[in-house]
């Protein structure tokens, strides 16, 4: 990892990360001997504005599940992931973020994993408060009848008591795809989150 092209204004125009890791993803152990390759580039044209792209290639091991077999077949199932996003975060004002990610595994000419996710977020720093509104979606193109296929509208607010302690309240309204509606028996759901976050 590193930074290049110093702006002379307290930040660099380009940050990069390159990693070779064990596991089916960089943060998860795997029993095979394949390595994951991870590459990430962040372009920072202005102090509060970042554009980032990430690519991950690896091979995961099928997991034996209770009552059935694992996803894929064998110890070396290919998996590709990429994420692109941009964000503008002024600690005294506007916070805008958007991100899209795709994950795919194809074994014996069949999609075993094919998933898409995205979100758009807008917020505004008001002293110790950060109110936000967010839209996000997730699409599982293989398991279309699960609750993983949704669009969500979220309204939330974070209150920073001090640097290492925050309280957060979120309300989310989920809307499900047609196949998920049929399988679940309902077309929407609600979620309320109340969280306390500490750093030591």
Question: Over which residues does each language-model region extend?
Answer:
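Outer-membrane beta-barrel pore domains
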Residues: 49-200
């Amino acid at each position: 990892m590193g930074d290049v092209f110093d702006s002379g204004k307290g930040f660099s125009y380009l940050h990069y990360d390159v990693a070779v890791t064990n596991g089916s993803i960089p943060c998860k152990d795997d029993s095979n001997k394949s390595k994951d390759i991870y590459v990430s580039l962040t372009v920072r044209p202005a102090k509060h504005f970042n554009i980032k792209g990430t690519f991950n290639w690896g091979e995961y091991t099928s997991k034996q599940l209770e009552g059935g077999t694992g996803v894929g077949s064998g110890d070396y199932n290919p998996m590709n992931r990429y994420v692109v996003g941009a964000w503008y975060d002024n600690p005294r004002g506007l916070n805008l973020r958007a991100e899209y990610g795709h994950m795919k595994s194809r074994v014996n000419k069949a999609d075993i994993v094919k998933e898409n996710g995205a979100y758009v977020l807008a917020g505004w720093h008001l002293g110790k408060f950060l109110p936000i509104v967010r839209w996000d979606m997730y699409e599982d193109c293989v398991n279309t009848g699960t609750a993983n296929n949704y669009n969500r509208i979220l309204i939330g607010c974070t209150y920073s008591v001090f640097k290492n302690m925050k309280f957060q309240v979120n309300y989310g309204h989920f809307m499900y795809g047609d196949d998920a509606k049929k399988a679940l028996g309902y077309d929407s759901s609600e979620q309320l989150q109340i969280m306390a976050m500490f750093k030591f």
